[in-house]
Amino acid sequence: MAMHLNENLDDNGEMHDINVTPFIDVMLVLLIIFMVAAPLATVDVKVNLPASTSTPQPRPEKPVYLSVKADNSMFIGNDPVTDETMITALNALTEGKKDTTIFFRADKTVDYETLMKVMDTLHQAGYLKIGLVGEETAKAK
């Protein structure tokens, strides 16, 4: 008592299924393009970072970068700031959320006093989550 559902379908019958192979091909190409382009859309301020052998941490969706160049000029993202305007710019960028992690990028030639001054300013303003950014190097064996 077997039942055949496609008894009348011969080799010349039309197939009514949607072919999704081209759609999948396009999606994979777009995925590759976005994976290549995403790291390029970060911060363009050139800073000579110190090396580190620690395990890299995962990135948040919208990281906030505070950069200090060798000449002690500061940038939030790609926008230049001064000591006086730094906290105002951070408050505007983070919408006043003090629990936002600030990724601190400093050139390796910046003196310790400048680093501590900037970190103290962040601390006094209520930004307690500060991540220090460094270059990845091969682990010592």
UniProtKB/Swiss-Prot annotation:
Q: Which gene encodes it?
A: exbD
Q: Where's it found, cell-wise?
A: Cell inner membrane
This protein's source sits in the domain of life called: Bacteria
Transmembrane segments annotated in the record for this chain: 23-43
Q: Name one GO biological process term.
A: bacteriocin transport
What organism, scientifically named, is this protein from? Answer: Escherichia coli (strain K12)
- A Pfam family annotated for this UniProt entry: ExbD
Q: Which residues lie on this side of the membrane: Periplasmic?
A: 44-141
Induction details: Induced 2.1-fold by hydroxyurea.
Give the GO cellular component terms, alphabetically.
cell outer membrane; membrane; plasma membrane; plasma membrane protein complex; transmembrane transporter complex
Question: What protein does this entry describe?
Answer: Biopolymer transport protein ExbD
Query: Which family does the record assign?
Result: Belongs to the ExbD/TolR family.
The alphabetized UniProt keywords are: Bacteriocin transport, Cell inner membrane, Cell membrane, Membrane, Protein transport, Signal-anchor, Transmembrane, Transmembrane helix, Transport
All ranges on the Cytoplasmic side of the membrane: 1-22
**Known function:** Involved in the TonB-dependent energy-dependent transport of various receptor-bound substrates.
Molecular-function annotations in GO: energy transducer activity; identical protein binding; protein homodimerization activity; transmembrane transporter activity
Q: How does it sit in the membrane?
A: Single-pass type II membrane protein
Query: Subunit notes for this chain?
Result: The accessory proteins ExbB and ExbD seem to form a complex with TonB.
Q: Which InterPro entries match?
A: ExbD, TonB_ExbD_1
